[in-house]
């Protein structure tokens, strides 16, 4: 299937913790700089971009020099609150190198479930777009207890990114991960696993091919990405799942390169 994203004017990019934090726990500064360059390039072309960024926990562990994620919810919240400040400080600094202004929006599930607060959120996004600002979104981990327990809030930022895409009426959601896309079976187990370039619907076979593992710093796994794709389908939009190793590949994707997996319903 030929890919054409010429009509994309509003884009949501989601980046996971594993793309921002190295296995050693150090921050991947090169990756963040590349991401800022790409988003700034798109911004300069007139494309409105929202960045949904995980990483508060990973940044917090780095700042506090902790090797493992705390077990207690209160400490998880504390570490995330420290990390969120560090992450946004770095984003602001790096984006400024490309003369791009950014803002922080921390959401909780109740914000998008109640009409009044949802309207306020939409107004905030639209105002930021009008001001030429790139919104950087994360869940408010310090008060969203269920995010810490992987339960019933947004659950993880995969789902949050799909919700944000709906809220802002995005033409495309690009989900950056530590995998190349959706395979027909687990590529870490089966050497003959094949990358699916195009997924027009979420079938039982697709669900069965999704695993459940996330990284040690994050909460998301393949199943959460598939569920996000389902939400995108419900919103009559489209999603790309691709490896975040080289953020500059986003530019190639938007030019039509067949990178990652495209989730798009048949016309």
Swiss-Prot record:
Top-tier EC class: transferase
Pathway membership: Amino-acid biosynthesis; L-proline biosynthesis; L-glutamate 5-semialdehyde from L-glutamate: step 1/2
Chief location of this protein within or outside the cell: cytoplasm
GO function terms (MF aspect): ATP binding; glutamate 5-kinase activity
Keywords carried by this UniProt record: Amino-acid biosynthesis, ATP-binding, Cytoplasm, Kinase, Nucleotide-binding, Proline biosynthesis, Transferase
EC number: 2.7.2.11
Residues annotated for substrate binding in this entry: 54, 141, 157
Pfam families: AA_kinase
Entry keyword annotation includes rRNA processing: no
Residues annotated for ATP binding in this entry: 14, 177-178, 219-225
GO cellular component assignments: cytosol
Catalytic activities: L-glutamate + ATP = L-glutamyl 5-phosphate + ADP
GO biological processes: L-proline biosynthetic process
Keyword Cell inner membrane: no
PROSITE patterns linked: GLUTAMATE_5_KINASE
Localization, UniProt: Cytoplasm
HAMAP family assigned to the protein according to its UniProt record, in alphabetical order: ProB
Stated family: Belongs to the glutamate 5-kinase family.
Described purpose of this protein according to its UniProt entry: Catalyzes the transfer of a phosphate group to glutamate to form L-glutamate 5-phosphate.
NCBIfam families tied to this protein: proB
Record's protein name: Glutamate 5-kinase
Source organism of the structure: Streptococcus thermophilus (strain ATCC BAA-491 / LMD-9)
Gene: proB
């Amino acid at each position: 299937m030929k890919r054409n994203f010429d009509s994309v004017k509003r884009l949501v990019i989601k980046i996971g913790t594993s793309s921002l934090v190295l296995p050693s726990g150090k921050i991947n500064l090169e990756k963040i700089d590349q991401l800022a360059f790409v988003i700034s390039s798109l911004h300069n072309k007139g494309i409105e971009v929202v960045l949904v960024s995980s990483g508060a926990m990973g940044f917090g562990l780095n700042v506090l020099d902790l090797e493992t994620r705390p077990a207690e919810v209160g400490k998880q919240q504390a570490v995330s609150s420290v990390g969120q400040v560090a992450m946004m400080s770095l984003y602001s600094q790096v984006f400024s190198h490309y003369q791009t202004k950014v803002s922080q929006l921390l959401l909780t599930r109740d914000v998008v479930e109640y009409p009044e607060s949802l309207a306020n959120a939409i107004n905030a996004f639209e105002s930021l777009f009008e001001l030429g600002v790139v919104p950087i979104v994360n869940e408010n981990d310090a008060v969203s207890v269920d995010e810490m327990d992987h339960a019933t809030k947004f659950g993880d930022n995969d789902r949050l990114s799909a919700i944000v895409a709906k809220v802002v009426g995005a033409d495309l959601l690009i989900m950056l991960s530590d995998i190349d896309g959706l395979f027909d079976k687990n590529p870490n187990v089966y050497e003959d696993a094949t990358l699916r370039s195009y997924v027009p619907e979420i079938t039982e076979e697709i669900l069965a091919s999704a695993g459940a593992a996330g990284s040690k710093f994050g909460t998301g796994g393949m199943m959460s990405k598939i569920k996000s794709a389902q939400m995108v389908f419900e919103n009559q939009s489209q999603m790309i799942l691709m490896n975040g190793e080289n953020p500059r590949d986003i530019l190639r994707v938007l030019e039509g390169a067949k990178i990652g997996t495209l989730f798009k319903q048949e016309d």
